[in-house]
């Protein structure tokens, strides 16, 4: 699904169909715990093995907690429901999207729509004034 192979390293796809934040790239984790067992089911009913859970992003500023590492997953996926469960509002517009903290009414990050897919580039979030980006804790 990467549209430009040179810039897809930290592209994250936002969608309401994902139940959890997930990636297949172990090198993105700044903190990681191995997990035994567990699978995720994709839209085509294929299953992916959960290898572990952890934190991805910048160590001191922008990060996402409770991201699953799924064996063989080719894309980085952000769950809209997980974002909302953490007290955020996700707003989709024709060419962009915004995630805002509802209590502080502060934009956490801005994404863009390219070829009908909303994405954010985690590596550029610090340029948008992002301080912290977290997800809910799951029992895995």
Describe the residue ranges of each PLM region.
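Residue-level marker of conserved, structurally anchoring positions within well-ordered domains
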Residues: 1-140
């Amino acid at each position: 699904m990467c549209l430009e192979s040179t810039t897809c390293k930290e592209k994250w796809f936002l969608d309401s169909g994902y139940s959890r934040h997930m990636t297949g790239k172990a090198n993105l984790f700044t903190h990681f715990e191995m997990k035994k067992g567990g699978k995720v089911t994709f839209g085509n009913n294929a299953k992916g093995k959960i290898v572990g859970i952890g934190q991805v992003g910048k160590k001191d500023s922008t990060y996402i907690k409770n991201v699953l590492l799924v064996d063989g997953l080719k894309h980085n996926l952000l769950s809209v429901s997980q974002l909302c469960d953490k007290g955020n509002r996700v707003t989709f517009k024709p060419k962009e999207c915004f995630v805002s903290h509802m209590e502080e009414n502060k934009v956490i990050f801005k994404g863009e729509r390219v070829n009908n897919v909303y994405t954010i580039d985690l590596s550029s979030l610090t340029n948008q004034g992002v301080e912290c980006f977290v997800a809910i804790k799951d029992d895995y």
